[in-house]
Amino acid sequence: LITMHPELEAWIDVCLARKVSHVVLAGGLPKGADIKRIKEGGAKVIAFAPALALAKRMIKNGADALVIEGAEAGGHIGPVATSVLAQEILPVIKDVPVFVAGGIGRGEAMAMYLEMGAAGVQLGPRFVCATESIAHENFKKAFIRANARDAIPTVQIDPQFPVIPVRALVNDGTKEFMETQRQVIAKFHAGEVDQMAAQLE
């Protein structure tokens, strides 16, 4: 679940009603009350921790496991390299399993993080072109044609509208996302929409 989403509470309700076994909280810092509510509902909580201090806070608030994800990841990313996060967090956090994500695509990298103390690794883009993937065929073809330099992170235009950067292949969709941000923020500043409505656009 994206923790900075304005409808997070409703999403938690759905997870609890469906009796899911694990809830992953990413895309912002979860409140302790949200972690507590999920755990009281019977699910385990996996939280993303982009720094050591936040990892400790997530554990104190009840997280059952952590994911540390570096800037090399596909999708939502943090500002620090995966290897730097691993060296900062893995030697210290021993109370809960820690999974490493971001830029991992080969067995040697997996072995390195396991050797450093990771409980496991998370891979996403590595599987996007698999037969089992529901990604559109055109996306799979674009992904196969692309190289690492074809994926760039999005940027935040206005601090009133926090954006967790997303690493994605540059295409018409990423350009449209940036233009939509500009238009929605302009509508907000002109008083045409309130902040919540703007964030949902």
What do the PLM-derived regions correspond to, one by one?
Residues 1-97:
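Active-site entrance/lid segments in N-terminal catalytic domains of soluble metabolic enzymes
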Residues 79-99, 105-201:
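Conserved active-site-proximal phosphate/metal-binding subdomains
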